[in-house]
């Protein structure tokens, strides 16, 4: 009995200790995360109420209708009222859970309401790192992100190698970043602070280290930070290509200029393989390669010249989509944004056509 009490005490202690952890999705710091928090709590409470009612009725029926010697065997007969109740109640339950869920999910696709114009950040995943290009400011960061408080941020998500998932739990849910396309995801920080971001989609041995730090600051501090970064080293193609290698250590870096001056990852998904070639990097299976041999042949300096911007995405050529290159001395203006928007519309059309074709192939509806 004492052993049972010890195990019970240990189990109870573990439950209490779990309450000391910082559950980030319940510590919302933005409007999108707040709506997600409400939806999660609403669903949990709603389902707990259902469980308590069902278990309570179960206990009552067991007690009231338990078998005894004087019990008369039950008689089955039709009861329209009861049958209507147990048919209608599940429909109400499903509707009560589905309506707010669907509404919230569709709301996520719309930018949070704000009096301030949204800013744009290109978030690119590659080499188990995150690259953040600020086209308006012409600066770029690696594994660190700084944004102003109370201003929507439109993240244009791209991947240069494996598919990843961009996630800042305290600001909102995750969204996938895929090769050969650009996905938009709008988030906003309603408070200043430092938050954690990560790739939430398992994509290989470096998955655990593909994280980044998010600094939400006042607009004044943000402007000051931008000015400081503009005074740092300009990002050149050799430096960027070296950072694309999984063998390059994950560090928080800041640069003047962006990779948008020499590559459009969505239009040129083959770019990263040329970067590998420049530094003699070869992907190896970590299960069959010793740690010291994983990256031993990688060159410190590029062995061949950098490649010019080009289109290797067949969809771009087929649909007349433009290569989006923004020089460090070129403005991120309406003309550039118009081409961005056109590419995005074509990409949505391609995605819809692919879904329709898949439905036709599998006998599904539209």
From Swiss-Prot:
Signal sequence range: 1-19
Alphabetized GO MF terms: copper ion binding; cytochrome bo3 ubiquinol oxidase activity; cytochrome-c oxidase activity; oxidoreductase activity, acting on diphenols and related substances as donors, oxygen as acceptor
Lipid-binding residues (covalent, S-diacylglycerol cysteine): 20
Statement: the UniProt record of this protein carries the keyword Membrane: yes
Transmembrane segments: 38-58, 80-100
Catalytically driven reaction(s): 2 a quinol + O2 = 2 a quinone + 2 H2O
GO biological process, one term: ATP synthesis coupled electron transport
Major localization listed first in the record, in broad terms: membrane
EC identifiers of the protein: 1.10.3.-
Region (Disordered): 330-366
Coiled-coil stretches noted in the UniProt entry, renumbered to this chain: none
Membrane topology: Multi-pass membrane protein
Protein name, as recorded: Probable quinol oxidase subunit 2
Record's GO cellular component terms: plasma membrane
Keywords annotated in UniProt: Cell membrane, Electron transport, Lipoprotein, Membrane, Oxidoreductase, Palmitate, Respiratory chain, Signal, Transmembrane, Transmembrane helix, Transport
């Amino acid at each position: 009995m004492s052993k049972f009490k010890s195990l019970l005490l240990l189990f109870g202690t573990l439950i209490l200790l779990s309450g000391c952890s910082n559950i980030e999705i319940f510590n919302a710091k933005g409007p999108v995360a707040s709506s997600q928090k409400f939806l999660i709590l609403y669903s949990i409470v709603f389902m707990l109420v259902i469980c308590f009612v069902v278990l309570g009725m179960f206990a009552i029926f067991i007690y009231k209708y338990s078998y005894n010697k004087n019990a008369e065997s039950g008689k089955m007969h039709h009861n329209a009222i009861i049958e209507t109740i147990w048919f209608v109640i599940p429909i109400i339950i499903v509707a009560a859970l589905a309506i707010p869920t669907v509404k919230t999910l569709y709301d996520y696709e719309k930018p949070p309401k704000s009096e301030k114009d949204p800013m744009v950040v290109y978030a690119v995943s590659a080499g188990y790192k995150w690259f953040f290009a600020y086209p308006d400011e012409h600066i770029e960061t690696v594994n660190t992100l700084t944004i102003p408080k109370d201003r929507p941020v439109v993240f244009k998500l791209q991947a240069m190698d494996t598919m990843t998932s961009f996630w800042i739990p305290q600001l909102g849910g995750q969204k996938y970043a895929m090769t050969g396309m650009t996905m938009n995801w709008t988030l906003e920080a309603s408070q200043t602070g430092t938050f954690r971001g990560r790739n939430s989609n398992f994509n290989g041995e470096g998955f655990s280290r593909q994280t980044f730090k998010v600094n939400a600051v006042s607009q004044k501090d943000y402007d000051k930070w931008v000015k400081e970064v503009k005074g740092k080293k300009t990002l050149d193609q050799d430096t960027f290509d070296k950072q694309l290698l999984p063998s390059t250590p994950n560090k928080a870096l800041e640069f003047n200029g962006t990779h948008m001056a020499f590559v459009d990852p969505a239009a040129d998904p083959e770019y990263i393989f040329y970067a590998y070639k420049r530094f003699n990097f070869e992907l190896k299976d970590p299960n069959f390669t010793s740690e010291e041999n994983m990256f031993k042949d990688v060159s410190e300096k590029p062995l061949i010249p950098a490649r010019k911007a080009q289109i290797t995405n067949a969809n771009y050529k087929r649909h007349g989509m433009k290569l989006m290159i923004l020089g460090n001395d070129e403005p991120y203006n309406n003309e550039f944004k118009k081409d961005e928007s056109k590419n995005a519309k074509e990409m949505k059309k391609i995605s819809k056509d692919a879904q329709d074709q898949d439905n036709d192939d599998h006998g599904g509806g539209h």
